[in-house]
Amino acid sequence: MNLKTIIVPLLAIAVQPLKAQTADSVVTLLFAGDIMGHDSQIAAAYNDSTKTYDYTDCFRYIKPYVEKADFALANFEVTLAGPPFKGYPQFSSPDALAVAVKDCGFDALVTSNNHTCDGGRKGVVRTLDVLDSLQIPHTGTFHDSAEFRQKYPLIVDVKGIKLAILNYTYGTNELPTPKGTVVNRIDKHNIINDIAAAKRLNPDLIVACMHWGIEYDTVPSRSQMQMAEMLKKQGVDLIIGSHPHVLQPMEVDTAANQLLVYSLGNFVSAQRTAPRDGAAMVNVRLTKHCSQKPKIEADYLLTYVHYPKVGDKRLFYIVAVADVENGLLKPIQSDNWGRLSQFAKDAREVMSRNTNVPEAK
């Protein structure tokens, strides 16, 4: 979480001074999957004594990995529509979730997904307002078309490497886009135009975060593969997928210098049936030599949502699978790591289909 500058086409927000770029500039990016907000997660975050919500503990064990990256991004798959707070099927989470996500080390969020319109116009607008108030950069949804034109794509300068970030969803569960707002949907013509607009801003790399695919299917669909091929041909360098809520394979095309991640799974949710109870974070290493295009390398880290019962409440902790396997989480070690072990076994089977994206060591 060492983001230096966030820039949009007509707006620049300086976060920290840029370091001088050396002959070989190395930048690390981290992408995480779906941040969900089911009823039991809301209940777990509630403090009966203070009558407030706090999600900080949920992220405490994964925070060191997120903070270590120069830039970290996740899919924010809830609305912040205000009370009454509720989970599936139409999510509205407490603002405290966004506070904890920022505290964990995430530098930006994508907001265009099938739950974007769950809270109607209030949900779309208030989510953006809360993220803005917390100074969390975001993209994919907008207050209006003027804001879309001004702020899309999101341009991020990370230690001298400039990224253009795009975000689209396949749909919004048949809910209409609230009047006046903009929710980016997967449309080939619009995407091609947006990529062309991104190129005019001269980024080092273009990132497309795609909410696509078939839920709970560990194999990419034909439409995912076709869209990925189109994105690559149009010049997108990093394709990061979400929506299936399970892992799907990843690949680095070393010849084309492009990364394709079909689905990262559930970063945090209350979906407890395998293989929805875990995910992966993909770590991307960018090496830029002078004016050359950055070289892309990647690996992945498996994560699991630990769900212990404490008193009459279920708690949620995102943990790195490797930390549990190596005995590094003794304060929360459990007799119930069997489900984690099964998730890890199944996840590694899916990841065995990766190309040039190994498990992090």
Task: Pin down the residues of each PLM region.
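Bacterial Sec-dependent N-terminal signal peptides
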Residues: 1-23
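Acidic, metal/ion-coordinating pockets
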Residues: 21-361
